[in-house]
């Protein structure tokens, strides 16, 4: 017998939530094989077994919060012949547990409910499917499988989605026939638990707002020259760098590095009574995912060329959306860039990332009339840029100077190429 424990994660992570069991009780487990997926404050990680054998016990359920070092499963010796057998065995164990658990008497209970409970027990389903059904009030007798003898968690989830869509359509048809009074307090709402990562993000954003003297300064950038350079070099860049595309993000990343070198206080953070000025340039690139906004870091941007930065950004974006980011991708950065322009944002005041002094916000490129000199007005592609910064560390003069440096480098992109 060997216990599987939650491994040491990043220094700041002490616990996580079991997102999904990847193995059921009775399943064969190889050494180094993942048995569950753990959701942490930053990324999802897989917990693996250090021993080969059979998963004999799950010590926590999906949705439970577990601490680093806590035992979550037991792997014993032996083998199971088929996956169906293991699922049947685990289902029988669940069934036995349910029979052993005394039910509280309820004067309102009916024979039909008891019949439903018994039918739930007779149905062959994996433990995770049963738990999910109990948690969400799904009747397993109404769940259709995928041709297997055993109902699995995804079968229950698919049944939920189908029921939800039916309920929505029924609700719409009912509402179309009658209007609720504006004074009626029972308006339709949907209440659901926030994911661990969503709760953590909400907590940290509030902490940053409350614990920093955050201020935002703005400028505008004429994107004419950088767009022209990108257009001229785009095809050759793709050929020279194995299909890597030249985007605007690499220009802003290199401009940020140059500005950070010129204004080192922007690359700093406060630690107690000390100010730590970082001598490295790990730039966070905000990526939107189904789980919310994630900020993986491109390491050593001062040592990377445009192609390497673009490749790294593309790789991190794919990993973020596929939930494959590691903890090393998400910690110990020095500065962050976020681009609300991809969603159509014209202007915003981004919130500083934790343990940093500032964040740069990019926005939509909008063609508008600009006075290029006192006698000439031309339509130019313009972008508003924003720098939110911690006024405890950075004075207004430095913040404005930093943003002005970004502006000048983007408007004269050849200077960035020379620096690279």
UniProtKB/Swiss-Prot annotation:
Biased-composition ranges, Polar residues, are 81-90, 103-127
Q: Which pathway is recorded for this entry?
A: Amino-acid degradation; L-lysine degradation via saccharopine pathway; glutaryl-CoA from L-lysine: step 6/6
Q: Per the database record, which ranges form the Lipoyl-binding domain?
A: 1-76
Regions of compositional bias (Low complexity) in chain numbering:
159-188
Q: Gene3D superfamilies in the record, alphabetically? A: 2.40.50.100, Chloramphenicol acetyltransferase-like domain, E3-binding domain
Does the entry feature the keyword Acyltransferase, yes or no?
yes
Molecular function as annotated in GO: dihydrolipoyllysine-residue succinyltransferase activity
Give residues where N6-lipoyllysine occurs: 42
**Which GO cellular component terms, listed alphabetically, does the Swiss-Prot or TrEMBL entry include?**
cytosol; oxoglutarate dehydrogenase complex
Q: Where is the composition biased (Basic and acidic residues)?
A: 91-102, 149-158
Q: What does the entry's cofactor note say about binding and number?
A: Binds 1 lipoyl cofactor covalently.
Q: Name the residues annotated as catalytic in the UniProt entry.
A: 391, 395
Q: Which cofactor does it need?
A: (R)-lipoate
Against SUPFAM superfamilies, the record matches this protein to:
CoA-dependent acyltransferases (SSF52777), Peripheral subunit-binding domain of 2-oxo acid dehydrogenase complex (SSF47005), Single hybrid motif (SSF51230)
The record's Gene Ontology biological-process terms are:
L-lysine catabolic process to acetyl-CoA via saccharopine; tricarboxylic acid cycle
Q: Where is this region: Disordered?
A: 75-201
What is this enzyme's catalytic activity, as reactions?
N(6)-[(R)-dihydrolipoyl]-L-lysyl-[protein] + succinyl-CoA = N(6)-[(R)-S(8)-succinyldihydrolipoyl]-L-lysyl-[protein] + CoA
Signal sequence annotation: none
How is the subunit organization of this protein annotated in UniProt? Forms a 24-polypeptide structural core with octahedral symmetry. Part of the 2-oxoglutarate dehydrogenase (OGDH) complex composed of E1 (2-oxoglutarate dehydrogenase), E2 (dihydrolipoamide succinyltransferase) and E3 (dihydrolipoamide dehydrogenase); the complex contains multiple copies of the three enzymatic components (E1, E2 and E3).
The task this protein performs is described as: E2 component of the 2-oxoglutarate dehydrogenase (OGDH) complex which catalyzes the second step in the conversion of 2-oxoglutarate to succinyl-CoA and CO(2).
Q: Which NCBIfam families match?
A: PRK05704.1, sucB
The protein depicted here goes by the name Dihydrolipoyllysine-residue succinyltransferase component of 2-oxoglutarate dehydrogenase complex
**What species is given as this protein's source?**
Staphylococcus epidermidis (strain ATCC 12228 / FDA PCI 1200)
């Amino acid at each position: 017998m060997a216990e599987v424990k939650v491994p040491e994660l990043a220094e700041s992570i002490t616990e996580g939530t079991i997102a999904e069991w990847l193995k059921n009780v009775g399943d064969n487990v190889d050494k180094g094989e993942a048995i569950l997926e753990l959701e942490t404050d930053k990324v999802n990680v897989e917990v693996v077994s250090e021993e080969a054998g059979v998963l004999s016990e799950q010590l926590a359920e999906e949705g439970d919060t577990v601490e680093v070092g806590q035992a979550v499963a037991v792997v014993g010796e032996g083998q199971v012949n088929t996956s169906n057998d293991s699922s049947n065995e685990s289902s029988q164990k669940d069934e036995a547990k349910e029979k052993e658990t005394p039910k509280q008497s309820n004067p309102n209970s009916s024979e039909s409910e008891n019949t439903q409970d018994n039918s739930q027990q007779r149905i062959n389903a994996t433990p995770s499917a049963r738990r999910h059904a109990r948690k969400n009030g799904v009747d397993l007798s109404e769940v259709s499988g995928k041709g297997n003898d055993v109902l699995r968690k995804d079968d229950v989830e698919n049944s939920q989605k189908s029921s939800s869509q039916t309920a929505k359509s029924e609700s719409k048809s009912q509402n179309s026939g009658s209007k609720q009074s504006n004074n009626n307090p029972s308006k339709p709402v949907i209440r659901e638990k926030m994911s661990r990562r969503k709760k953590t993000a909400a907590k940290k954003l509030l902490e940053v707002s409350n614990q920093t003297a955050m201020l935002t300064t703005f400028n505008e950038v004429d994107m004419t020259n950088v767009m022209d350079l990108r257009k001229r070099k785009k095809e050759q860049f793709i050929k020279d760098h194995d299909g890597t595309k030249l985007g605007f993000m690499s220009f802003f990343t290199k401009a940020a590095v140059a500005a950070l070198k010129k204004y080192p206080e922007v690359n700093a953070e406060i630690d107690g009574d000390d100010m730590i000025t970082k001598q490295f340039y790990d730039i966070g690139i905000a990526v939107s995912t189904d789980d919310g906004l994630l900020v993986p870091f491109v390491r050593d941007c001062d040592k990377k060329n445009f192609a390497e930065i673009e490749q790294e950004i593309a790789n991190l974006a794919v990993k973020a959306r596929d939930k494959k980011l590691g903890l090393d991708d998400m910690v110990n950065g020095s500065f962050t860039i976020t681009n609300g322009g991809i969603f159509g944002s014209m202007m915003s005041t981004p919130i500083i990332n934790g343990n940093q002094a500032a964040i740069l916000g990019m926005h939509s490129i909008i063609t508008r009339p600009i006075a290029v000199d006192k006698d000439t007005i031309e339509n130019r592609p313009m972008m508003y840029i924003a720098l939110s910064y911690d006024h405890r560390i950075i004075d207004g003069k430095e913040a404005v100077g930093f943003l002005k440096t970004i502006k000048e480098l983007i408007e004269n992109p050849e200077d960035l190429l020379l620096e690279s």
